[in-house]
């Protein structure tokens, strides 16, 4: 079996990581007089690295972050110095996911809630957790569509079982009439079973009016806050700062 045939056989065995680097590693083995066990170790490590990278890629794609580039490395904590940094970094360790706890990020628009939520989602993926991200109005629209096409049970199963569900921008857009009922069902089914991270620009006192069902909102908040971490963002807005800077530059 020559090199090309061997690479083809490796791919048939789903060992594409080894097939891709085989020629390079064989050349290295000859150049460095590597022992057979060292060569095999390198090839196995290459395959494991490739599989790990592809798994992370699939999980990021499944999470469907709105802004995949948002990470903690790109967040300026000095812009809002009163933000609880310790809580942010504690959440980024993802220990709250292992404990099946929840998180609630509150504050005006443009204060970094979505950035931090997605950054924590990225950290969770790096640590081996599955994540599902949706803006609140998109999530509820998809749930309504699932009712129409008969896939609500399957979609709800996804929402119930994913280790971290991020519901972003709650209260930013108009919500369907079934929003209170649907959100309460999601929260109840996930309570003490999986972690939910919710962001909102509306104070919790307004949620009853927003959803038109005070009882449902009370039940939902009771569960989120029972084992929940609350992060208050703001008051300064990045978008306001950017707009002011742009306007100043055009004067």
Where are the language model's segments positioned?
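Conserved P-loop
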Residues: 83-161
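Active-site catalytic microenvironments for nucleophilic, acid-base chemistry
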Residues: 46, 123, 127, 189
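Interdomain "pre-motor" coupling segment immediately N-terminal to P-loop NTPase/helicase cores
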Residues: 7, 17-68
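Solvent-exposed alpha-helical segments within well-ordered globular domains of core cellular machineries
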Residues: 4, 8-11, 20-23, 41-42, ...
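Intrinsically disordered, low-complexity and often Lys/Arg-enriched segments
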Residues: 1-8, 246-251
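Dynamic helix-loop-helix/coil hinge segments at AAA+ ATPase domain boundaries and subdomain interfaces
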Residues: 9-12, 61-84
């Amino acid at each position: 079996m020559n090199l090309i045939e061997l690479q083809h056989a490796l791919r048939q065995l789903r060992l594409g990581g080894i097939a891709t680097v085989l020629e390079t590693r064989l050349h290295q083995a000859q150049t460095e007089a590597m022992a057979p066990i060292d060569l095999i170790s390198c090839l196995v490590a290459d395959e494991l690295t490739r599989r790990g990278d592809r798994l992370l890629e699939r999980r990021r794609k499944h999470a469907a972050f709105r802004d995949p580039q948002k990470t903690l490395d790109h967040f300026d904590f000095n812009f809002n110095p009163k933000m609880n940094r310790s809580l942010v970094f504690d959440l980024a360790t993802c220990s709250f996911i292992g404990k099946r706890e929840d998180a609630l990020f509150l504050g005006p628009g443009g204060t970094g809630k979505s950035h931090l939520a997605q950054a924590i989602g990225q950290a969770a993926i790096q640590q081996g957790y599955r994540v599902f991200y949706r803006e609140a109005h998109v999530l509820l629209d998809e749930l309504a569509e699932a009712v129409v096409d008969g896939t609500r049970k399957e979609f709800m199963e996804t929402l119930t079982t994913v280790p971290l569900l991020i519901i972003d921008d709650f209260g930013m857009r108009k919500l369907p009439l079934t929003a209170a009922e649907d959100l309460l069902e999601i929260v109840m089914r996930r309570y003490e079973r999986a972690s939910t991270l919710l962001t909102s620009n509306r104070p919790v006192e307004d949620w009853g009016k927003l959803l038109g069902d005070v009882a449902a909102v009370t039940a939902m908040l009771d569960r989120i806050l029972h084992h929940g971490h609350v992060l208050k963002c703001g008051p300064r807005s990045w978008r306001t700062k950017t707009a002011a800077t742009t306007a100043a530059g055009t004067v």
